[in-house]
Amino acid sequence: MAKPSTPSRRVVLPRSLNNSTVNPPASAAALQGALLAFSHAVPPKPQSPMMADRPPVSLLDSDPDPPSELPEPGSIKGKIALFSANSTATAPSDRPRSAHESVPEIARQKSPQLLAAEIATGSVQGPGGKTTSDDVQRTRLQRNGAVPSRDLSSPIPVRKPVINPRLLDPYQDETPEHSPPKPGSDQRPVSSKSSASPRPPIRKPRPVPPPIPRKPSPALSEPASKSASHRFENGLRRDEARKPPLPLRSKASAATLSEERPPTLPPRRAATAHDLYINQSTPGRAESPAGLSSSPSVVSLYSPAHNASRTSVHTVASRDAPSDAVAASSTASNRALQARKSPPPPPPQRRRRSRSRSLLHVQHKKDRTPNPSPGGLRETLRPQARSDDEDEQRRRQHKSHIINKHPHKHNEGERRRWRSEITEKERKRYEGVWAANKGLLIHPSQVLDENLEPDKIPPGMYPPAALDMVVNLVVRDIWSRSRLPNHVLEQIWNLVDGQKIGLLTRAEFVVGMWLIDQQLRGHKLPAVVSESVWASVTRVPGISLEPYNTKH
């Protein structure tokens, strides 16, 4: 039968000792020293079945401000040696234990280094199932022979340890009660070895955490994009930059994640008509998952899964963003120009004819006489200009004078003077105007009979040849189109009107038209029209009107 535990073994600390807590920096220093000693001495143990379901805990999930100073290794080793010696002296291995002080198999396998780490951080669980520093101090006082003042019904709560005790020992068993550890026969060499010269460090391989389940893509999940945009609006980007990086994953998991996740793109600006056109013209980019929307790139940059590689992505994206934009714009413009400037399809080629038919066609072409190509404008019914034309001669003489002689010298012999006759060309032109206007505004009843004598013509009647004459009203209308003053036109009328009856014959009308042209060319009007001018109008070319007997 197991002996009940004597009350002298449980030492209750006074209130002053319970209230005095260990400073957080000292406890953190003791924790780091214990961890260092544990990593040097304890080999890796197989994971217990009770801890198989517990997820791996990262060391960086605790307080983000651990102390930077490490304790001296001598003090930690001394504490561990003292603890092992006291436990050996006070707790013999053959002492029977009570039922409530029985320790499970996992607690028996704990080494002195693990127990030292638990004592340093105050992680030994009390009788109530909670770890308190009172139990640790009670154990120390019992071993040192201190007498407790009085028992307390319940321990006074002290300040919580700085670091989670689960971080110290992943194999710690959560049992409702723990009795003081029973040192075995294998503890003495371990303690002696720990106090002796240090062994070469044996690093415990970290357990490989299971691969983090891949979250749904932010481009395809709407809630993720909404939460990311909300965090981006609240300014969580600066908070994430201040936090320490997440624990590094193993190489295998990092390789799988890098293969599965495509590289993220930088945040794009607001979509415009030009961007929509580029996306439509480049189907390769439109089908990519990053091109589904403008927000996924922002969400992927600020999601927790990408915090570790966020800075490198920013630097690479900032460098590649201008080049990608330039390349996209150039390709889009080139494709647009090619689509616009693509030439129409060539016309279908003619089928090649047989050789015999082509030879016959060539012979037929040779037999035909080529049509004379027109050298210039097509000829009309008008006759060509004669060599005696006044304008043609004047132009030729003027050109020759400019080339051969000095332009400021005058040749009196070739000077154009007043002509005493009307050319045939001018006469024909004036006679055409007369023929178109003769007999206008003359009533046939006003024309006298040819049998009447000129002395018996009543007033208001016209001579018998009045139908071949032009009335003064018609003459004034035609001559006024020359834009000469009225007094000049009156002078010309007086020079050519010989009948004084308000009518002009053919010769009078032609001479009057000729005088108007001379006035327009800058010549002065003569006092009397010369006979040569009248003769050039009345003479028919090729026929002499003179009587035959005058020549003899």
From Swiss-Prot:
SUPFAM superfamilies given for it?
EF-hand
Write out the ranges of the annotated region (Disordered): 1-25, 41-419
| Domain called EH: residue spans | 451-540
Compositional bias (Polar residues) at which positions? 306-315
Record's keyword terms, sorted: Lipid metabolism
Q: Which cysteines are joined by disulfide bonds?
A: none
Q: Where is the composition biased (Low complexity)?
A: 188-197, 288-305
Q: Where are the compositionally biased (Basic residues) regions? A: 349-367, 395-409
* Pro residues: bias regions: 207-216
Record's keyword annotation contains Lipid metabolism: yes
What GO terms describe the biological role, i.e. biological process, of this protein? lipid metabolic process
An example Pfam family from this entry, by short name, is: EH
Q: Compositionally biased, Basic and acidic residues: which spans?
A: 94-103, 230-243, 410-419
UniProt keyword Hydrolase, yes or no: no
Family classification: Belongs to the IRS4 family.
- What is the documented function of this protein? Positive regulator of phosphatidylinositol 4,5-bisphosphate turnover and negatively regulates signaling through the cell integrity pathway. Involved in rDNA silencing.
UniProt name for this protein: Increased rDNA silencing protein 4
Q: What organism does the record attribute this protein to?
A: Emericella nidulans (strain FGSC A4 / ATCC 38163 / CBS 112.46 / NRRL 194 / M139) (Aspergillus nidulans)
Q: Name the gene for this chain.
A: irs4
